[in-house]
A protein has these predicted regions:
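Bacterial N-terminal signal peptides that target proteins for export
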Residues: 1-9
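Repetitive helical segments and hydrophobic/amphipathic motifs
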Residues: 11-13
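N-terminal signal peptide c-region/cleavage motif recognized by signal peptidases
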Residues: 17-19
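PEST-like low-complexity, intrinsically disordered acidic/proline/serine-rich tracts
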Residues: 22-303
Length: 303
């Protein structure tokens, strides 16, 4: 009898202890909320808007050269997918699936599928190392994850060059992306930390949120290369330093002080306010005034 009790107690202890090593199930269909940086993510950032970005001078110079016609003229840009760091902020649903170890039934990999550009990424949880620096770089990079309690921390390297914003702000192949995934009920929050020594002077921290939507379907994204604007072969629309006439529009539309619009690490901290004592906001909003969620951001003047 004592032996039976001991065995039963042992089994019960194992069941009670199991949740301590349990893994959070992130699988499902997740719909984006667009509650963070709505204008930047839905209609897209204005030209010259580098607010909130700890850019260095080289990145700012590169961004100033941007001409939106580049996408229409250079066909290779038209179907270029979002990279792993930007896919999280794009206009598309997210589907997460998992692979399980046959012996332990523990999750050994997550797979993400984002509708925009049909981006697919694998996040390995089996402890494998990242490849050497000279290994191939891709738009989704190489991702591994580790558990910290109920939080999954993901590290992604080997990213092809991409962009931080869709207004020409670049992101280099030296970038390293760290993500922290957490679930609260039916809400998924991902806090991302991007380090890029070629572009940023400090890490760039952003967050994105989704809600569980079982009825959602992340569909296909057919994309066709089409010459939209006539141009001579080999033309790449751009602006030389100091010649971009469109950078002033953002300052005028929103009455944003030029010192803040240019970005830089110092603009992220409260002490920077002391440099803006003469700043006076506009008396009333004139552009994207109702930009809350998706529908209210489709037009500068509202729905």
């Amino acid at each position: 009898m004592n032996r039976r009790l001991a065995v039963a107690a042992s089994c019960l202890a194992a069941l009670v202890a199991a949740p301590a090593s349990a893994q959070v199930d992130f699988t499902g269909q997740w719909a984006p909320l667009y509650q963070e940086d709505t204008i930047e993510r839905v209609p897209g950032p204005e030209l010259g808007d580098y607010t909130g970005l700890p850019l260095n001078d080289a990145a700012r110079l590169r961004a100033d050269s941007w001409d939106a016609d580049r996408i229409s003229v250079v066909e290779e840009y038209q179907c270029r997918p979002h990279s792993a760091d930007y896919s999280l902020r794009g206009l598309a649903p997210l589907r997460i699936s998992a692979d399980y170890d046959a012996q332990t039934q523990r999750i050994v990999a997550f797979h993400t599928y984002i509708g925009a550009y049909e981006n697919r990424r694998t996040i390995f949880l089996d402890g494998r190392p990242h490849p050497p620096d000279y290994a191939a770089h891709t738009f989704q990079g190489f991702s591994t994850g580790v558990w910290t309690g109920n939080r999954l921390t993901i590290t992604t390297t080997h990213l092809k060059p991409g962009y931080l914003r869709r207004n020409g702000v670049p992101r280099s192949a030296k970038a390293r992306l760290t993500e922290h995934w957490t679930v609260h009920g039916s809400y998924l929050t991902i806090v991302s930390v991007l380090e890029d020594p070629a572009i940023l002077t400090e890490p760039l921290v952003r967050s994105q949120s989704w809600f569980l939507d079982p009825g959602q379907r992340a569909g296909l994204f057919p994309c066709e290369y089409v010459p939209e604007v006539p141009a001579e072969p080999g033309t790449v629309p751009h602006h030389l330093p100091g010649t971009n006439p469109n950078l002033q529009e953002y300052l005028d539309w929103y009455a944003v002080p030029a010192e803040g619009a240019r970005g830089g690490a110092e603009t992220l901290y409260p002490e920077f306010q002391s440099k803006l004592r003469s700043y006076k906001p506009k008396d009333r909003c004139e552009r994207f005034c109702n930009c809350v969620g998706f529908a209210g951001c489709l037009s500068p003047t509202g729905p």
